A protein has these predicted regions:
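N-terminal, polar/Ser/Thr-rich
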Residues: 20-67
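Solvent-exposed beta-hairpin/edge-strand motifs
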Residues: 28, 39-42, 85-114, 160-188
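Short, solvent-exposed beta-strand/turn "edge" segments of beta-rich domains on protein surfaces
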Residues: 51-53, 62-73, 90-92, 121-125, ...
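Short beta-strand elements of extracellular/lumenal beta-sandwich folds
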Residues: 68-85, 150
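Intrinsic-disorder/low-complexity, polar/charged segments enriched in Ser/Thr/Lys/Arg/Asp/Glu/Gln
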Residues: 73-77, 86-88, 127-131, 163-167, ...
């Protein structure tokens, strides 16, 4: 018996919605009590220790140029690893907030193609991997600098939220520095600068929204 499952991710003020059919035998084998204990209703909870076994990894590489500061459009390279096995799925972005969308790599996926503001998938097998490139209208000018707002990220199945791993690398023009970040740094949520880039690493359940405020150095 197939059910309809939703795994939703929201990136850079766009809406990548991961929707799938089938492949939920692992869920059906669990008892009602086990499911109730494991389900997160949506409240953000950072995981100080990564869970055992493969977890959906959502990696984002963002490039902000001088042109981005004027237009709000940034370069985006995004990869999904350890996707759940499903018959059909799609990643849907918000209309008008994504352009030049293309699939750059796929593994253990029978077919992957762009359709409008979405990426359609068929035959997603175990240990699947998908990479895309696009331009995203994600940067917002403010009086005191710029805001890069991402989220909410979530891995949703039926009525529950499950562990997810999100990483991000942000490359910005010289003279632009990170002024603040939300949520605050804590176990399970790290933000740091290395090799001239900003890096974010988050292990969590529920819904995650990140806000990176950037400002010009004097």
């Amino acid at each position: 018996m197939n059910r309809f499952a939703i795994l939703t991710f929201w990136l850079l003020a766009c809406l990548p919605a991961w929707a799938s059919e089938g492949g939920d035998e692992w869920w059906q084998e669990k008892t009602d009590t086990e499911r109730a204990l494991e389900v997160n209703p949506g409240e953000l909870e950072f995981l100080a220790e990564p869970p055992e076994g493969p977890v959906h990894h959502h990696d984002n590489r963002i490039t902000i140029t001088e042109a981005s500061l004027a237009s709000g459009w940034i370069g985006l390279r995004q990869c999904h690893q350890h996707l759940d096995p499903v018959g059909r799925a799609q990643i849907v972005f918000g209309e008008g907030r994504i352009r030049a969308l293309r699939v750059t790599a796929s593994e253990n996926i029978e077919r992957a193609w762009v359709e409008g503001a979405s990426v359609q998938l068929e035959g997603v097998r175990s240990d699947a991997r998908l990479c895309i490139e696009a331009e995203s209208r994600a940067l917002h000018a403010q009086d005191d600098g710029y805001l890069l707002k991402n989220g909410p990220y979530m891995r949703r199945f039926l009525d529950g939220y499950f562990p997810m791993h999100v990483t991000m690398t942000v490359e910005a023009p010289e003279g632009l520095q990170l002024a603040s970040v939300e949520p605050e740094r804590q176990p399970g949520f790290r933000v740091w600068r290395e090799d001239g880039r900003y890096h974010l690493d988050a292990w969590f359940e529920g819904r995650l929204v990140t806000r990176l405020r950037l400002e010009r150095t004097p």
